[in-house]
């Protein structure tokens, strides 16, 4: 198989879909890998490392997409990449289709086999390719939030850890999943007072045990959420419904009652966000203010630390890349129910129910199409 690795073109996206180590393994397995020049440069993986591993360095994205049987990326294609789509192309990347109906339409129109990292499941039913970036984003969310709490960046001027004689800042984490637990770890490490809000009482019990009672846990309902965000200096949004648009847990009315200069970091923004006042931003223009509250809603937060993020992501994605290359997409999808869950579009048909529900489109299970 010919595997193409284009350079990411989303604003300040600096990760890369395959590392030199991955290239070496693919080439040794008899596959050909085309890497766009400088695709890995911002992840501290220069062209000469890819060449040494056996990749062919290609000068243009057009040729990478045109010649590859399967394109491996990190982020969902942006509008200027839509022209590369063609029938039968296998696209393996984060897709986050629920809030992007125009991308869905293009993938369907061109009959692309779109396999989304974020909906692949393992035998335990977890989301193994979403986990590493959720870990990075969860930990980063507190770093970013702490920075934006500084007065110079529009925040309240609060030091999260406080100092002797001055209480620490309050951090409210909405969602007790991978993002939430990693955000809580960093916030606690900085000395903040941390509250985690979740709908699942069993998860709250687990978190209480994990943190040995040192975090506050709160059952999610509108009354509790209103109170928690009103008291918070920093709110982290980390709610996920796999494949679907994130539910709006924090409403405009709740935001209007928050402290002036408080900060919101909505990590769920690539699925539409779980804060009603959140809208997607970029690393070039990351933050804005609503009702005196600073909002940081960058859709590709882990791109700020691309070396760590690329290594963490490809550790998880590469076994699937190798399986798809070795078996071909159809056979690989047929053989692995978890990989089937990752197929969002196939031969012009939408195959992911949460995306279909979010966009009001018809869908079919991919198993019925194979």
Predicted regions and their residues:
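Glycine/serine-rich phosphate-binding loop and adjoining beta1-alpha1 elements at the start
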Residues: 2, 8, 77-170, 298-300
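An N-terminal-biased, well-structured beta-alpha scaffold segment characteristic
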Residues: 2-106, 110
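Short glycine-/small-residue-rich Rossmann-like dinucleotide-binding loops
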Residues: 69, 75-76, 95-96, 221, ...
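Rossmann-like adenosine-cofactor binding region
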Residues: 209-291
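Generic hydrophobic/aromatic pocket-lining and core-packing "Φ" positions
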Residues: 23, 47, 104, 142, ...
């Amino acid at each position: 198989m010919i595997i193409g690795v284009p350079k990411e073109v989303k604003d300040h996206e600096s990760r890369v879909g395959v590392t030199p180590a991955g290239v070496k393994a693919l080439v040794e397995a008899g596959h050909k890998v085309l890497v766009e020049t400088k695709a890995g440069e911002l992840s501290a993986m220069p062209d000469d490392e890819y060449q040494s591993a056996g990749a062919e360095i290609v000068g243009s994205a057009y040729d990478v997409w045109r010649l590859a049987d399967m394109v491996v990326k990190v982020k969902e294609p942006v509008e200027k990449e839509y022209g590369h789509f063609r029938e039968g192309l296998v696209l393996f990347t984060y897709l986050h289709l629920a809030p992007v109906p125009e991308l869905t339409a293009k993938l369907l129109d061109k009959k692309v086999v779109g396999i989304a990292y974020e909906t692949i499941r393992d035998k335990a039913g977890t989301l193994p390719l979403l986990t590493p970036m959720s870990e990075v984003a969860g930990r980063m969310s507190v770093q970013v939030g702490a920075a934006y709490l500084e007065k110079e960046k529009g925040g309240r001027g609060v030091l999260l850890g406080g100092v002797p004689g001055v209480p620490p800042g309050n951090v409210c984490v909405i969602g007790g999943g991978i993002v939430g637990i990693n955000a809580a770890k960093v916030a606690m490490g900085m000395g903040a007072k941390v509250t985690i809000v979740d709908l699942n009482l069993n998860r709250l019990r687990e978190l209480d045990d994990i943190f040995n009672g040192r975090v506050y846990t709160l059952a999610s309902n509108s009354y509790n959420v209103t109170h928690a965000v009103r008291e918070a200096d920093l709110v982290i949004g980390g709610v996920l419904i796999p494949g679907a648009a994130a539910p709006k847990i924090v409403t405009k009315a709740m935001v209007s009652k928050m402290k002036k200069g408080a900060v919101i970091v909505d990590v769920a923004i690539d699925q539409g966000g779980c804060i009603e006042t959140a809208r997607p931003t970029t690393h070039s223009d990351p933050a804005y203010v609503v009702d005196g509250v600073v909002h940081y809603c960058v859709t590709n937060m882990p791109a700020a630390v691309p070396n760590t993020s690329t290594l963490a992501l490809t550790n998880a994605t590469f076994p699937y890349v190798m399986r798809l290359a070795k078996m071909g997409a159809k056979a690989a999808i047929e053989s692995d129910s978890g990989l089937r869950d990752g197929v969002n579009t196939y031969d012009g048909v939408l195959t992911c129910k949460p995306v279909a529900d979010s966009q009001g489109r018809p869908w079919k299970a991919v198993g019925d199409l194979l």
